[in-house]
Amino acid sequence: MKSTLRHKHREGGTALMIAVSSLVFLIPLVGLAVDAGFLYVVKARMQASVDGASLAAARALNLGQTTAAQADSAKQNAVNWFYANYPAGNWMSRNTTMTTSDTHVRVYDDTVNPNLRHVDVMATSQIPTFFMKYLGVDATTVQAIGHASRRDVNAMLVLDRSGSMGSSCGALISAAKTFTGQFSAGRDKIGAVSFADNVYLHSKPTSNFQSTLGYTNSYGTLNGELDTIACAGGTATPQAIMVAYNELYKLNQPGALNVIVVETDGRPNTITVNFWDGSAAGIASTSNCLDKNGKKKSAGGFATLASLREWTPGYNMNVGGTGYMANIPAGLVGGIGGTDSGTTAFLLFNSWTYVKTDTYNETNNKQYPTSTALSGCAMASNRNTLADLAWLPTTDIYGNNLVNGSYRAVSTSGGKISPISMTQIRAAAFNGVDSAGTRIRTNATVPAHVFSVGFTTSVDHTVLQRIANDPDWMGTSACTTSGQCVVNSGQPQGTYVFAATTADLVPAFLSLSSQILRLSR
């Protein structure tokens, strides 16, 4: 019995010795696990702060009047963001280092894509240990690295200066200048067209857009081309969109973020077409309309094939238009517009489009090209008559489809729009806008995002949703009521913003600029 008790005591002593010996190894292991867990949490917080700092730096690349100033803004923004989220002493850290030097924030151009800038951000900090310090390891240096990129933005503003915008012209100008003020001068390229009965190219996309167009931002305000806009006339929306996109197409920078921003307060009611046809002129046989050369329909309508060939290189010579042009000579094409009232106003113009040359300079009180009725036309003296027209083509001069059975119904006969009525022309204008949006988004060479601003309750929400390809409008009452909103998931998606009053215009343009800048990263 005593022998058994002594044996049990020996076993207990052995177990105690083993347990004590194990603690020698277990305590460091537990300490290592605690320290490692703490370091993991701190590193994750630090990494999140660095990632946020890199994104903040990329966002700030549009702040500053020069590229050097923009780089400085990016660096300072990165530092500010980092320390706001990971202040000195955070989590008992020591010697946290994040400065505006190139060592910690580096801004540089991409070596392949000249329209891409990168920001690399790096921060270090020493994190104290709790248990490992007893083994001679007082602290561990933690490093976090972040990266962000920003594509340059090429944007064209398409601004409605029709008569219905009259009292709101000033608010539109202010909103457009606020938009330009959000982008990176010297890197981004912005241009603008305005439209009524005709389309005016205020500026091709340029990196000097702030001095050319004008701007408003935290640095101040500057007047420019946008301040010369005066509002009067009809709504040639399809033509304006294509003139704007033509400038992006000619710029030919697919590595940039290419954007069209369309603002309108009305409904498209004007199409721009070529009335020449090899077998049948678009002018009725009884019409006395004269073309720009003073000839009647026997000479081929408003534009002869010879004058069609005057178009500068870059235009696809297919009649009806399927390409893009470098310029549009005044008086080349006839155009026709119909008001929304349903009772009045069809006019043909011989000076439908004017594109400003590089050397053309205007000051205030800009004189837009006059849209005059062609000599001899019955509608020159009676705007309610359609007697001059025999038919309309199914595409406009840019190749936009004016007949779309899935959107606005347009009747045809013999491959032409016929009979001609105000309802037909308005529907064709809607289809032209819709077609322009689709062709811009799906162009294989320079695809672009389309954004839109609808102003006042007279606007048609559906067509602006369709050209923007905005999925967020699908559940709205406007879309459910019309049943004609469409989203093409395989195409670039933009945003449609509705501005009910003049006070909503600046917020609407700011909202779009923020979304465009977000896409550029």
Describe every region a protein language model picked out.
Residues 6-11, 30-37, 194-196:
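Short, mixed-charge, low-aromatic patches
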Residues 1-12, 17:
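N-terminal leader/signal peptides at the extreme start of proteins
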Residues 2, 37-521:
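P/S/T/G-enriched low-complexity
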Residues 17-34, 44, 48:
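Alpha-helical hydrophobic helix detector
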